Amino acid sequence: MGTTVTPPKQPSGPAQTAANVLSVADVQSIVTASAASVNVPLAIAVSDRSGNILAVYLKANAPATAQANFGVQAPAAEVAAELARSAAFFSNDQAPISTRTVRFISASHFPPGITNTESGPLYGIENTNRGCGFNVTYLPGQSLPVPMALSGGPSLGILTGKPDAMDSNNLAVNPGGVPIFKGGEVAGGIGVAGGDEATDEYAAVAGTLANGFVPNVPSPGVVVVGGVSLPFVNQTTIPAGEQPGTANGSYTLGPLASPGPAPEGDLIAETGSTQGGLTQSEVHAIVQNTIATANLTRAVLRLPEGSRARFVIAVADLDGHLLALYRMPDATMFSVDVAVAKSRNVIYFSQAPDELSPLPQGTAVTNRTIGFGAQPFFPSGIDATLPGPFFSLFQYDLANPCTQGHQAANPNQNGVVFFPGAAPLYHGSQLVGGIGVSGDGVDQDDFVAAAGANGFAAPQAIRADNYSVRGVPMPYQKFPRDPEN
C-alpha cells in the first residue's frame, strides 16, 4: 500500500533586487561574448526583465530579416528583440524558461509531434504581449514599459517559431531566446536571430555562459508538466562545422543599463467601478483572496517541488477599465499582459452576441471556454477533425493585434488569450466585472482565479459548461487534483 508524501511548502522568490539589474558593462559583455561565439552574421538583442530593450547589435553582414512566427519574415533586429523579451518574460528566479520551452508548451499537441494528444497548455501564446498598452495610470515607481516594436507600434509578440495557424509542424522552433540571470535572479534575456536554429541558440547561450549569467536550477533540475520534462536549451556547444568569430559589428541601440528592478505589488491604485458594479472594498477583497489562495497553491513552473505559485492578478470593470493590477514577487512578466487581457475577455465574451456562436448570448464564459473552441482540431486531441467553432476568432486576433474580437475599437483592448485563468464576476445574475490570473500552470491559474471570484461566481445555470457544441461538452474551469500538495 503506497504512502502519500506531502512536499514542503517552499516559499517562492522575492522581488528582484536593485543589485541584480543589468549594467551597461553587463550588457556589453553579454553581447560581445555572443557575437564572438560563432563566425556567422547575426542580430543580437538584450532585454531587461521588464521588457526594456537595452541593446541591439548587428554583426557585419547580418541578414536584414529573420524568421518570426507563422511564416513571417521580419526585420532581424525586431526578431532578436522579441526573442530576448520572450525569454525574460517567461523565466522566474526558480526556473529558467527559454523560447524553446515556450514553443514546447504551446504547440497543437503536447508533447509536440505526438498525434492525438491535446494542445499544449499555452496554445495561442504568440498572440500576447504585442505592445498594446493597458490604458492605466501606474503608481509612482510602478510603471512598466509597453513592449512595442523597435520601430513603434505593435510588436511581434512572444516568439516561438510556430510555422502557421494550423501548427502544421509541431517541431518547428525559434530557440534563440535565453534568459539572463544575475545573482540568482532573472535579470533579462538575450535574443539571437539570423542563423539556423542551432547557431542562434548556441550564440544566445554563449552570451550568458561566458559571463556567469546563468541560473542556479534547484533540484530536480527540470520542470515537469503532466509527467513531461520541459526542454530548456539543446545547443550548448558550437555547432558542427562552425568556427568562433569576432565581435565585428555595431550597436544600433544602446548599450544601456536597466532602469531598475521589475515592479511588484500594486501596480495601479485599487478603485471601484464607475459602471455601477464592484465597489473598491469588493475589488480589494477579490485581490486579497486571490493572493491568499496563491500562497497555498503548489507551483508547477517553479523549483524545487513544493514551491508556492506566484501570479499577476487583474480585475476589470464592465468597460474593460482596470480596477486592480497586482504582481506577486517574482511573478512572470508575460503574465501582466495576459492577466489584463483575460480580465477583459471574460467580460466582453460573456455578453457579446455572435462572437462565440453557437453559445447563446449572455453565456458566462472563461478563457478556457474560448481557447477550447479555438483549436485547429475540435476537440483538441482528436486529429483530422475540423477546427473549433471559435477558430476564426483565433485567426482574427492573430491578424489584428490589440483588438477584442469584433468589439468596437477602444483603449481597453489588448488582445484575446486562448488559455485558462479567468472568471467573469457577478452580483447575483448581473455581470459586474472580470478577474484574470496568470503565472503558473493553467489549471493553477484557473483554481486561483476561481478563489478570487468566490462570492462573485457566475450563476450555474448560465455557465458555458451547460452546453455542448457538435456533441462536445464545453468547459468552464478545471482545477488541479490536489492544488496545495
Please name every model-derived segment.
Residues 8-485:
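Flexible, solvent-exposed loop/hinge segments and secondary-structure transition points
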